Every structure is written in structure tokens, then in C-alpha cells.
């Protein structure tokens, strides 16, 4: 069994990206499954091209994309991604698509095919905060999640894919003391726990409360 984990390069003026820094330190094997990490550019469409090339080479069973969500207080597996780019800032190549479909021939939205509630449960068992998120945003994170699930639908139906957002790492908030952050060690532990749940449960979701009132 093989798991491909992606993380973005720094963007938005940040010197580092906890997604990339965390996955670099992942073990090569988790719960008996082979784990490979991949750096992707924080660029619309190019990020998907890099992912597709690696999926073709590596032939993973699972794809877990990781992204930074500054301001979030917990690790948040994403439930859904919409077919819409609406960038509030430019990506790393100065692209800023506004109200643009990601794939004109794609579905209006795709749901994660990973066991997101099992992932949340596993992260919480490590003593770390986690919750299901119902919005992946409309920047490159959501773009890549959508593209991954589009590729799965069109070309690799045996693959299960999804996305998880993580908080800032502590180094990023030294001068922003009121901004939520988490140590890189804990972020990595949370990602490992999520991968463990993916391997254990596959696409068999747990029937747990994970919704919101608004």
C-alpha cells in the first residue's frame, strides 16, 4: 500500500510553510504502508500538473494533500471542494483567477474520498485539536484538492484522495502573538495520525458527529 502526501512551498510572503516542513519529516513507512512526500508549487494549475505527474510515476493508493490555513486552531480534514477559483491574493506566479471554474468539464463539487471523521478521531487520540472542515477556501489549496479528485474520477478511480489544512507553525507567529499556531512536531504527529487512520479505514468512514450548525 502506498500513500502520497503533498505540501506547498511558502507563499504570501511567508518564509516557510508548515505543510512542507511537516511532511519532510514523515517516516517512510506508517502502519505498514509506504509513504512518499511531494513538494508542490503554490501556483494554480501548475500544482495539479506536478501532482498528476507524481501520481502517474508512483501509482499511490491514497493521496493526502496538506495546506497551511493561517488562523485555524486545529488540524482540519476537508469534506468538500468546489469547482471555483476565487483568489484573494496572487499565487507565486502572480496569477489571481477570480470566479473561474477549475475544470469546465468537472463536477460542481467533489467530496473527499478519505475517512475524514476517522482522521479527526485519530488526531484527537494524540491529544491534538482536530475537526472536520466544510470549506477548503477558493485559493490554491482548494484548487489542488479539486484537481486531485478530478484526476481520481477521470483517470485513477482506484485512488482515494483528500485534503487537510493545518495551522501556522510557531515560527510564523513570533511577531503575531494572538494568532493561533502549533509546533511543527505536533503538526507532524497529527499528520502521521491522519495517515494511520487512512490506512486503517480506507474509504470506510466512521459514523461520528462532525457537523456544524452554521
UniProtKB/Swiss-Prot annotation:
This is Pyrrolidone-carboxylate peptidase 2. One of its GO terms (molecular function) is pyroglutamyl-peptidase activity. The lineage of its organism: Bacteria, Bacillati, Bacillota, Bacilli, Lactobacillales. GO terms for cellular component: cytosol. Keywords: Cytoplasm, Hydrolase, Protease, Thiol protease. NCBIfam families: PRK13197.1, pyro_pdase. Belongs to the peptidase C15 family. The gene is pcp2. The active site is at 78, 141, 165. It catalyses: Release of an N-terminal pyroglutamyl group from a polypeptide, the second amino acid generally not being Pro. GO terms for biological process: proteolysis. It is an enzyme of class 3 (hydrolase).
Amino acid at each position: 500500500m502506498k500513500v502520497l502526501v503533498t505540501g506547498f512551498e511558502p507563499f504570501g510572503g511567508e518564509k516557510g510553510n508548515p505543510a512542507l516542513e511537516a511532511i519532510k519529516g514523515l517516516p517512510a513507512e506508517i502502519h505498514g504502508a509506504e509513504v512518499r512526500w511531494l513538494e508542490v508549487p503554490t501556483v494554480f494549475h501548475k500544482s495539479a500538473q506536478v501532482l498528476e505527474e507524481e501520481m502517474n510515476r508512483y501509482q499511490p493508493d491514497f493521496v493526502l494533500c496538506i495546506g497551511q490555513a493561517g488562523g485555524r486552531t486545529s488540524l482540519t480534514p476537508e469534506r468538500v471542494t468546489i469547482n471555483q477559483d476565487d483568489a484573494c491574493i496572487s499565487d507565486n506566479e502572480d496569477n489571481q483567477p477570480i470566479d473561474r471554474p477549475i475544470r469546465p468539464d468537472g463536477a460542481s463539487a467533489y467530496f473527499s474520498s478519505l475517512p475524514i471523521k476517522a482522521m479527526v478521531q485519530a488526531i484527537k487520540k494524540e491529544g491534538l485539536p482536530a475537526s472536520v472542515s466544510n470549506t477548503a477556501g477558493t485559493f490554491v489549496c482548494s484548487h489542488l484538492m479539486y484537481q486531485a479528485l478530478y484526476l481520481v474520477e477521470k483517470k485513477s478511480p482506484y485512488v482515494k484522495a483528500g485534503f487537510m489544512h493545518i495551522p501556522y507553525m510557531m515560527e510564523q507567529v513570533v511577531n503575531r502573538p494572538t494568532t493561533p499556531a502549533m509546533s511543527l512536531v505536533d503538526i507532524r504527529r497529527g499528520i502521521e495520525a491522519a495517515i494511520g487512520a487512512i490506512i486503517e479505514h480506507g474509504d470506510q468512514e466512521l459514523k461520528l458527529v462532525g457537523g456544524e450548525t452554521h
